[in-house]
Amino acid sequence: PPLGPIAPTAHDMRREHRVLVRLGDAFPLAPRSYALCTDPDILGVDFHVMERRRGIVIHRELPAGLAGRPELGRRVGEMIVDVLADLHQVDPATVGLGDLGRPEGFAERQLDGWGRRWHAAKDQAVPDVDRMLRWLEAAVPTPQVTALLHNDYKLDNLMVDPDDPATPVAVLD
């Protein structure tokens, strides 16, 4: 975990450990978490020890050996979407995570937050955004399906095969 001040719900090692333990075989890209330490005398923060996976994490640039392969971008992009869709297929209740989060009203809360952030940040009127927000608010599906979400899903929270970055090895964080 990062050391120093963090947002109250960010990097909750107890929650992360619990989720990784419960995902087990239901989502093979989740590394196993073997142990949780909550003793502040060890590192000063909670941490967990998880399975080592071998692969690379791509940040802003492809590693030198992978550059110059234009087909790679599309394959990696499709893989990112497929992996997230696979995670969403895991039923939280089936893996013992039915009590995680607050699924009721989730979409409404997200739209409300997006709208508030938009109105606080916009420096000019953009009618299309306001229209889109109204449309989304009117189109929230009912009933909503409960699914596991990764709150920081992005390329550098995926570990991929070093020889073929379109092959996922692990989902991190």
Feature locations, PLM:
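ATP-binding pocket architecture of kinase catalytic cores
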Residues: 1-148, 162-167
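Alpha-helical structural signal
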Residues: 16, 155-156
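Catalytic-loop of the protein kinase fold
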Residues: 148-150, 155
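Hydrophobic residue at the +6 position relative to the catalytic HRD Asp in the kinase catalytic loop
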Residues: 158-160
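Conserved active-site aspartate in kinases
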Residues: 173
